[in-house]
Structures are given as C-alpha cells and as structure tokens.
Amino acid sequence: MTVKVWRGDKNGGAYQGFDVPRQDNQTVLDVVSWIQQNQDPNLSYRFACRVGMCGSCAMMVNGTPRWTCRTHVNKVLDANTLVVAPLRNLPPIKDLVADMDPFFDKWIEAGGHHNPSASRYDTMPQIAPDDTKRAVANESIECINCAVCYAACDTVAHNDNYLGPAALQRAWTLYNDEKVNDRDAVLAAVSGKGGCHNCHSQGSCTLYCPNDLNPMRAISGLKAATIKHHIKGGR
C-alpha cells in the first residue's frame, strides 16, 4: 500500500510517500512505526501505551482525527492509500508530532483544575453514587485529553480564542462536582470571548471521541447554566 506521511515543522512541509507491506490486523500506528524502523529513522511521531489508554498517538488519518493505535488499516484504507498527518488545529513541531501547548493552555484557561472547598483536615464529604450531579460529573471523567475533539472542531479551526470541546467538557464536570467551592468562577471562565457560546453545535467532537463521550452535551449544559446565571444577576 501507499502511505503518504506529512513531513515538516511549524515553517511548513509536504507529504512524502512510502511503500509499506500489508499485514493482518495492522494498525495505523504499526504502519508509522514500520516506516520509522525500516525506511526513515528520522520520522518523528508520538506514542506511549499502544493500547488506547493514553491518547498520545492521535493523528489525522485520511483527514479524520483518530487514535492510531486503535485504528486498523483495513477499516480506513482508501484506494490502497493511507494519508497520515499531525493533529489539525495544533501547530506541528516536527512531522507527525503536534504541539499540545495551546490545547492545555485553553484547558487551564477554562478553569480545568480542581479547586476544592475543603482541606485535607476536614471530614470527607459523603456523596451518594446515584446523586444527580454526581452522575452528570461522571459522564466525562474518562476524558484523557487526547485532543481528538479539538482537532475535529471546525470552530477551533476558525476561532483562535475558542476554548475547545475538551476544556469546556472539563469545566462542566467541575461545575457539577459538589466538592468544588466556587461554581460561579467556573461559569465566569467559560463565558468570555472564547467561551461556550462560540460553539456551533456541529457535533464533530462527539462524533469522533474515541471514548464515546459527549462534549457537545456538556457544552450545551454550560450554555444553559451561564444564561441562567446571567438572568439571576450574575456577572
């Protein structure tokens, strides 16, 4: 098969073609690794666990963001051709390695870190597993920040200020966490210039999430919460 791999850096690049032998149960990550090991040792790419737990191997495969370790070639091969590139909406560092700093910077900007209302010396709060807010918060805790949703989002592509699906989903998780002290601060963080109301509800984030999460539903929740907060006199 023919594999076209993007080569370059932040200053630009182009696709380079490789002839790669087909194998049974071959993943896209297997293909990239074979190229690096057998044809071009200078090819740069990122991976770690190889079993769909870390998300670090995410790349664009035939125009779609995917975990390459869980993407089998026989499901995505088009006319015996595979096109592999770094994640969209992030600046490339080298070849297939995308710079994740903008993604995590926006995660922090959206208030993604936990601000507990109690200290280690306080009694641990008892929250029932079937508590409504606990259930909502639990919906998104399997996010591993792979940035597939960020790469899939057209709003991110056209709005540099937009926080992105993963950051907003994390904010929704914290907003529904009873242990968070200042929930108004969460809403303030996602109500600004790049906040939740920039989302066009196209649903690409939900469609392509490898963990079957629903960032669009989380963003819709934030939209409703920020509007209610504003109506009640919040700023």
Q: Can you annotate each of these PLM segments?
A:
Residues 1-104, 150, 154, 158-159, ...:
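Iron-sulfur-associated redox domains of electron-transfer enzymes in respiratory
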Residues 26-41, 85-235:
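Ferredoxin-type iron-sulfur electron-transfer modules in oxidoreductases and energy-metabolism complexes
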